[in-house]
Amino acid sequence: MGKYRTFRLAAIQAAPVFFDLDASTRKACRLIAEAGKQGATIAAFSETWLPGYPFFVWGSSKDPQLQWKAAADYLANSAEIPGPTTDQLCKAAKKARIDVVIGMVERDKDSQGTVYCTLLFIGREG
């Protein structure tokens, strides 16, 4: 086997600010900066980190009104790609000189409510 490039991975073990895309994005940017300062070359967040994925969103709740409100909040806090959320994440990755992998709920700009579980990869160039 040949030589392989080594890397330092920051596995982000932090919760987002559920149903608050803006606050979660700011938190992600802080965590990206911290990972870069600690020498990581890749920061990896979990699936649907933005805006989080509370288990009750799609039916675990016994209260239908709460379930519908949670689903509406979930949709409202999803992000279009590209958009302001990805712009902020790209700037943070570039400033920290770190690759970023983050799971996010992507809202389809051409539909009324379609979302995708997207894994976004941002290079250290932003």
Language model segments and positions:
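Cys-nucleophile CN-hydrolase/nitrilase-fold catalytic domain and related Cys-dependent amidase chemistry
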Residues: L21, R30-R124
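Eukaryotic N-terminal low-complexity, Ser/Thr- and Lys/Arg-rich leader segments
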Residues: M1-K3
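Active-site-proximal beta-strand elements of phosphoester/diester hydrolases
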Residues: T6-P16, T118
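N-terminal phosphate-binding loop and adjacent alpha-helix
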Residues: Q13-R30
